[in-house]
Amino acid sequence: GESFFLLLSPNIVVQAIIKERIMQKNLVIVESPAKAKTIEKFLGKDFKVLSSYGHIRDLKKKEFSIDVEKNFTPSYEIPADKKALVNTLKTEAKDAETVWLASDEDREGEAIAWHLYEVLKLKPENTKRIVFHEITKSAILKAIEQPRDIDLNLVNAQQARRILDRIVGFELSPVLWRKVKPALSAGRVQSVAVRLIVEREREIHAFQTEAAYRITAVFLVPDTDGKLVEMKAELARRIKTKEEAKAFLNACQGASFAIDDITTRPVKKTPPAPFTTSTLQQEAARKLGYTVAQTMMLAQRLYESGFITYMRTDSVNLSEFATTGSKDAIIKMMGDRYVHLRHFETKTKGAQEAHEAIRPTYMENQSVEGTAQEKKLYDLIWKRTIASQMADAELEKTTATITISGSSDVFTAIGEVIKFDGFLRVYRESYDDDNEQEDESHLLPPLKKGQKLEHGPIIATERFTQRPPRYTEASLVRKLEELGIGRPSTYAPTISTIQQREYVEKGNKDGEERQFNVMTLKDRQIKDENHTEITGAEKAKLFPTDTGTVVNDFLTEYFPDILDFNFTASVEKEFDEIAEGEVKWTSIMKNFYDKFHPSVENTLAIKTEHKVGERILGEEPGTGKTVSVKIGRFGPVVQIGTVEDEEKPRFAQMKKGQSMETITLEEALELFKLPRTLGEYEGKSVSVGVGRFGPYVLHNKVYVSLPKTLDPMEITLEEAEQLILEKRQKETERHIKKFEEEPELEILNGRYGPYITYKGSNYKIPKDIVPQDLSLASCLELIKLQDEKGPATTKKGRFAKKK
């Protein structure tokens, strides 16, 4: 152990300090077991590394937990599932001579270190805070050589965010329960993200498509060997109407064409900066199809394994070690010509984050061990980092202007050729929008000024203006970053939360057929035809739900500050100022609360004539009763009649794809034709209806979902019978074994294989055991073993213990 540290520094004083420390008992506490495992490899037997499994305490879940009168003092508690762990850490800390708090280096990590210090009742004289933005031997040893105190400014910045968000959530949610519907909740940053999605949806619905004609021509030009080759050119302007486009083609019939001007200029393309959290989330979504949450989970694993630097950062800076490593790797693989070392400047302030971009810890490692998904993400990070230190791509762009006799219009032909690929050899950046994609490079044939050109087909194609695209998770992150809303640590949770709360849903939209006109001038004849195309198809886009739209409109009206982009961005800046020690966190809380709380009180006192979000569609033919849409207890509903009528109102659930903002009176009335009875099967009635989860068949109190291919208005009794039988078959296959003497225990077949379910909890069955052979005693033994293992083996999802 001693010689292990003596390699670190020639400085005798440092050696003596480290030697003294190494003789003592050292306890290192980190957040995750994976991180602990990696660090343990570097520190040797004199150091014990334990994990806190994230935060060991938090604000009380079901209480406000903030004493506004006492300077916003928070009330923290240790969750029940962390108590045993905290006791273990207390015992270990008591026995240790030095405790090293090695949680992550951002605000969240600093807060974890502070909570550990407080809860474990550590003493300043034997507590050291160490930080590093990569888990490598040199980084860990350097951190141990340079410990510091807990930075209370960073802790206060994190605490301020947590408390402000708790105030907003706890005070706004009851307003939503009373005014919109029960069980809703509101979040500060999430509400702004929902607003962006709602506004984009309205822009799309309000968008008026305009048509215009794009004119392209094919010219036949002799190549270097005299062979005629095709050169494409485009008219410099769009033509508004079909009549004008036809007149233009007619004018071209007798016209002559000539090269008026040729310009050739060099073009340089510079590589993008290394990854920050948001650019990694965007590129992983575009190139690999990962969700924002998936990217962060994989990046965390890569970081904890020591493969990449810290994954929550808004810095594009690279250390000298990284640039040197990149240079060596580039020379080895591609030669000196491909090297161009660069220093990128970080534009966002964000003083709380790690001070380096996301990069591989060792640039010589072109690949790493891990799952296929981890390997792909690592490869993306490696390529982006290497590319950032590579030479510009050198291109040559040639533009030829072609005149038309008797017209002031000109055609333009553009050719581009890569002279030196530079960083493009390794990496090309992707785009959210297809329009941003660049055309493939192509050369123009040799041309001379004044050269007469022979034309092939000249085509006028009707094209349409494009509505704004819906957000993807990645483009929403980009927008939030542009607006200065949120920070690297908040993008992924924000996007997950708005979907979990069902304010936003990720989905696909089928395209619609559209006709467009094409006129072709060829062999002195104009051919006029209509073609069909599919337009507007979208995949994995974010759509606002009706509840999300109603909540957004309500908050925008009564709490404009919370929904204001500039206000939300200014709060982020205030958190940065707290982190830098420029301002007291309590004064920011007070300024916010003094304005916010009265508006909550005032809103609760307002009495409205209509329910929030209600929209009157018209009257029911024959009865004259009001037909409306509103948010009901379980989501959006169509209602015929009002509570004032003698008869009770009738309700119908909307179909998937219908929205409160766009549903028509006719579509609403159609919904009341359901449920409809199809007939009888096995002596019981079979009916079809629409519920909050879509259309269903109901038979003998059993609901069966309708597949997308079947329309509830057209389904036959025979088709319904088939669905009932298929559901029964699946149920039979799901139940493997039951025990009469213990009715709460059952062996089931799930989507991930067989498992035991008992008293609301699920337990794994080892792969080498045949589920059918298990006795009740064997099942109880497996349950006991897994319960004893505690939090280390508890998994989120199917095998999570239900509270």
Regions found by a protein language model. Give the residues of each.
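Short glycine-centered, acidic/aromatic-flanked micro-motifs in structured strand/loop junctions
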Residues: 103-105, 282-284, 312
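Flexible beta-alpha connector loops of hexameric P-loop NTPases
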Residues: 75-79, 287, 483
